[in-house]
Amino acid sequence: MNADPLETDAALPEQFRIRRDKRARLLAEGRDPYPVAIERTHTLAEVRAAYPDLATDSATDDIVGIAGRVIFARNSGKLCFATLQDGDGTNLQVMISLNKVGSETLDAWKVDVDLGDIVYVHGNVISSRSGELSVLADSWQMVSKSLRPLPVAHKEMSEESRVRQRYVDLIVCPQVRIVAHQRIAVIRAIRTALERRGFLEVETPMLQTLAGGAAARPFVTHSNALDIDLYLRIAPELFLKRCIVGGFDKVFELNRVFRNEGADSTHSPEFSMLETYQTYGTYDDSAVVTREIIQEVADEAIGTRQLQMPDDSVYDIDGEWETIQMYPSLSAVLGEEITPQTSVDRLRAIADRLGRGIGPEILDKPSYGHGRLVEQLWEYTVGNTLSAPTFVKDFPVETTPLTRQHRSIPGVTEKWDLYLRGVELATGYSELNDPVVQRERFGQQVRAAAAEEDEAMALDEEFLAALEYAMPPCTGTGMGIDRLLMSLTGLSIRETVLFPIVRPHSN
């Protein structure tokens, strides 16, 4: 029989052992430190809302039952003070007085309660002599005994600890709670904005037999039931287009996607993605909708379109946004004309001139053709400099296999990327719906894979079969929710996700 580590581990911190012993004593005395339920009548926020202007040093006859986490406590001889915190961050003072509860109940509070405990307090609403809205207890109860002490201050937590113990971070840092609620508001506002425009939300497979819809390396798993390898999806695109073939007019999906690639301040292997598809629209139409939705989301989740960053800089996302074209903007910064006809040798010569600090991927990838070279050069010379919201449009054909060729400009496709603060935030297409051309594009990708191109898209015969039933012209967009919140707040991707992936502690 395995020994209980709580009973045998002498290396436990002293505070842990003290609190564990209190738990054991409460149980021995018949006082459950983890009761199944309590009779809470009000949240802390409801108490504050009900008594906004209670006069200093006054009392009411109103009785409430409240619960919260003890984040501050001060014990004196005949009167104890504590600050309780609710899940939304609301604080409220409670007072335990000898005259009100008697010596036994007061002494139990002093002995049993530690910072971090969740307690229930029953009593009447008053205002203290200092004017602090409070609940004067006539009884109290332990609701959940905390065996681990909270950090004294947020600064005590390292960045790694904040990520690993986000639950503690949420307790001690108000800004973390604010960002978590902003994320909820962002997702709610996106759904509301799309539904108001007639979009229907659908669900498509997370597990797929082919990894398609984007150029990315997938996570691979195996189905024991089917005895085949499956892939965590890298994008929902190809299934959403099947919905368009089947007759949906406007669809969207907001859910998780997975890419087995690097993790840094702007990338995560698992992230939330919004994709939308609208029939009989072009990439110009989807750019307008994307701008409007982001502005509406800022209104709802942040409360302003003047985005205040942690470094005190301000980004204005109101009004119309600038639009530039990839080839002309790259030509302007390089000082020479770059077109879809510019040779690979010339592009590599430019990369060599710029140096490894500008384009390491270019120098280390001999398989890169014209399109990848142009995109990499543009990203390093133009994209990273775009602070204000900017649409860059008209991409090389070979890097956009699912996109319609431009109506009037040879060698480019009708695609835009949206940049804000130097980060790609969203992308939009006039979708390719010619099944013959789509098959040719997939063939080019397969050949790229044969040339050791890690991010080539697989040939999806089932998707091609769907296109052969005729898909109406449409426009599609994709936007990372994590990056949207990054753009709205100026935070890193790990700070916008409640529980980002971290390497587990070794034993």
From Swiss-Prot:
SUPFAM superfamilies: Class II aaRS and biotin synthetases, Nucleic acid-binding proteins
Protein family membership: Belongs to the class-II aminoacyl-tRNA synthetase family.
Protein name: Lysine--tRNA ligase
Enzyme class name: ligase
Binding site for Mg(2+) 1: 417, 424
InterPro entries attached to this UniProt entry: Aa-tRNA-synt_II, aa-tRNA-synth_II, aa-tRNA-synth_II/BPL/LPL, Lys-tRNA-ligase_II, Lys-tRNA-ligase_II_N, Lys-tRNA-synth_II_C, NA-bd_OB-fold, NA-bd_OB_tRNA
Location within or outside the cell: Cytoplasm
Co-factor binding comment: Binds 3 Mg(2+) ions per subunit.
Catalytic activities: tRNA(Lys) + L-lysine + ATP = L-lysyl-tRNA(Lys) + AMP + diphosphate
List of residues binding Mg(2+) 2: 424
EC number: 6.1.1.6
A GO BP annotation: lysyl-tRNA aminoacylation
Record's keyword terms, sorted: Aminoacyl-tRNA synthetase, ATP-binding, Cytoplasm, Ligase, Magnesium, Metal-binding, Nucleotide-binding, Protein biosynthesis
Assembly description: Homodimer.
A GO cellular component entry from the record: cytosol
GO function term, MF aspect, one: tRNA binding
Superkingdom classification of source: Bacteria
Cofactor: Mg(2+)
Pfam families: tRNA-synt_2, tRNA_anti-codon
